[in-house]
Amino acid sequence: PSMVRSAAKNHRFVTILTDAADYAELIAQLAENDGATTLDFRRRMAARAYAATAAYDAAISQWFAFADQGETFPPRLATANTRAATLRYGENPHQQAALYVPQRV
């Protein structure tokens, strides 16, 4: 995770991919930009990299929190969730809402 975060931090100069599903877009970027990627693409990939490492860190945090047998409830709760759906409206019709589900790490 530290190398992924480091690459994401330096997204102005490097491209980081954390999902093989992004390979096709990377190849298109390289073809369209004379072997380079755009800053917008690098920013989007950096955001995905940080999301991936945050989910990993949350999973580790939860493992340690629940590994402590002396506590009924952990002192803090860290979760990583993914948007599953954008809902028609929130609690009231003028509000926006979305449904989030636990992310698999």
Region locations from a protein language model:
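Short alpha-helices
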Residues: 1-13, 18-22
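Active-site loops and adjacent core secondary-structure elements that bind or stabilize anionic groups
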Residues: 21-105
